[in-house]
Amino acid sequence: MDIPPLAGKIAALSLSALPVSYALNHVSALSHPLWVALMSALILGLLFVAVYSLSHGEVSYDPLYAVFAVFAFTSVVDLIIALQEDSYVVGFMEFYTKEGEPYLRTAHGVFICYWDGTVHYLLYLAMAGAICRRKRYRNFGLYWLGSFAMSILVFLTGNILGKYSSEIRPAFFLTIPYLLVPCWAGMKVFSQPRALTRCTANMVQEEQRKGLLQRPADLALVIYLILAGFFTLFRGLVVLDCPTDACFVYIYQYEPYLRDPVAYPKVQMLMYMFYVLPFCGLAAYALTFPGCSWLPDWALVFAGGIGQAQFSHMGASMHLRTPFTYRVPEDTWGCFFVCNLLYALGPHLLAYRCLQWPAFFHQPPPSDPLALHKKQH
């Protein structure tokens, strides 16, 4: 997978978030939630106009360029918020976390800001750079799509269902377009042609003739997917208040964060159970039986989603903003960390396997009628 150069123009534009946020933080009129929402919408609108004016050719070639440019700006804002909440910087975004979206001050909110300000930011620059040079960015787009969708679905649902539901301000409604963007962007990314592979028909036939036992790496991934599926189901039952002793011990001694009334961990586990659990079963099937050409794409999507989710979940479980009673106990910290780290790494190994050795997932080549006729006679 080729890594496209980063978009310098968008990088420079996104860094304007630093002086803008600092200046707005000292405007006394922004102490009212409605003014915060209106000013935020105005800034994003002006930013979109600026991007369209400065990069009309790129936007005409691929409208997602404008989306990536605006989101790169918001990623820098999110990184500022995370650094501010952890007391690394001061005087930038206090007005927004107080009057705009106070739930960003939770441990979960801090870590999704860290992820958005680092991983998503680099993805935006890479994808925008690819558009500038008329190159493909399909694989980066699929990973971003999964990560972005998981982040926004868990965060918005947790805001509505958790203890911060009474703290929803007008700025919350600015996130509604964030629900629509993944749908549109997903269709655009999936419609892009796949990168060409060097798999010949003979290579595909040879690879697809091998059984699962002849492919030890795939066998290991299937075993992982089965174990991950059981772990996903178990944690889903835990947050659904399953009365068994195993669930009781786990939620109190291993992951008490699942009881946190902010609701983000509960929503996250249910997302895993309803979406990741079926994917584990389907992926295990695709690694066993050849010709499942859908797996490489969806492996990237789920790798992005699970990577983002596990980063936020693990970080929030140990962060000081999480009440002490809901943090991971010291005596079970090692078990918690290893299990959750493996849960995050597995989908990335699956995606890497699918991208590097895709022959097994290609559609079987059509049989040669002439060769078949000679064989029969």
Curated annotation (Swiss-Prot):
**Keywords on this record?**
Endoplasmic reticulum, Lipid metabolism, Membrane, Repeat, Transmembrane, Transmembrane helix
* Keyword field contains Amino-acid biosynthesis: no
Q: Which residues form the EXPERA domain?
A: 61-186, 217-351
Q: In which tissues is it expressed?
A: Substantial expression in liver and intestine, whereas all other tissues analyzed show low levels.
Where is this chain primarily localised?
endoplasmic reticulum
A Gene Ontology term for the protein's cellular component: endoplasmic reticulum-Golgi intermediate compartment membrane
GO biological process: one example: lipid homeostasis
* Recorded GO MF terms: identical protein binding
Q: Where in the cell is it found?
A: Endoplasmic reticulum membrane; Endoplasmic reticulum-Golgi intermediate compartment membrane
Which Pfam families has this protein been placed in?
EBP
Determine the domain of life of the protein's source: Eukaryota
> What is the topology of this protein in the membrane according to its UniProt annotation?
Multi-pass membrane protein
Transmembrane region positions? 10-30, 34-54, 63-83, 111-131, 140-160, 170-190, 219-239, 269-289, 332-352
**Which family, according to the similarity comment?**
Belongs to the TM6SF family.
What this protein is reported to do is described as: Regulator of liver fat metabolism influencing triglyceride secretion and hepatic lipid droplet content. May function as sterol isomerase.
Protein name stated in the entry: Transmembrane 6 superfamily member 2
